[in-house]
């Protein structure tokens, strides 16, 4: 049984979050949580929270055994970017993109 959890509009770029997602793809959830606990990146905390939510969803909604679960799929899509202005010298301005992402974790007992 596949169970999904999503974090939409996460305040990190998809490029940075994908680095963390690649670390746990296909792993057992216990090993994945351990990897995320000791990964020194902001995105690791966000991905860990989504993974814990997916595990809780599987246990509560589907009655799955946590020991059998593995990360079947994990992907990070780009969300909308917030445009901001950074003042520069001589009256100019640069545009800053505050990027967001959508993190999706699918756990499965198969």
UniProtKB/Swiss-Prot annotation:
The keyword Flavoprotein does not apply. PROSITE patterns: RIBOSOMAL_L22. InterPro entries: Ribosomal_uL22, Ribosomal_uL22_bac/chlpt-type, Ribosomal_uL22_bac/org-type, Ribosomal_uL22_CS, Ribosomal_uL22_sf. Keywords: Ribonucleoprotein, Ribosomal protein, RNA-binding, rRNA-binding. One of its GO terms (biological process) is translation. CDD domains: Ribosomal_L22 (cd00336). It holds the Pfam family Ribosomal_L22. One of its GO terms (cellular component) is cytosolic large ribosomal subunit. GO terms for molecular function: rRNA binding; structural constituent of ribosome. Part of the 50S ribosomal subunit. This protein binds specifically to 23S rRNA; its binding is stimulated by other ribosomal proteins, e.g. L4, L17, and L20. It is important during the early stages of 50S assembly. It makes multiple contacts with different domains of the 23S rRNA in the assembled 50S subunit and ribosome. HAMAP family: Ribosomal_uL22_B. PANTHER family: CHLOROPLAST 50S RIBOSOMAL PROTEIN L22-RELATED, LARGE RIBOSOMAL SUBUNIT PROTEIN UL22M. This is Large ribosomal subunit protein uL22.
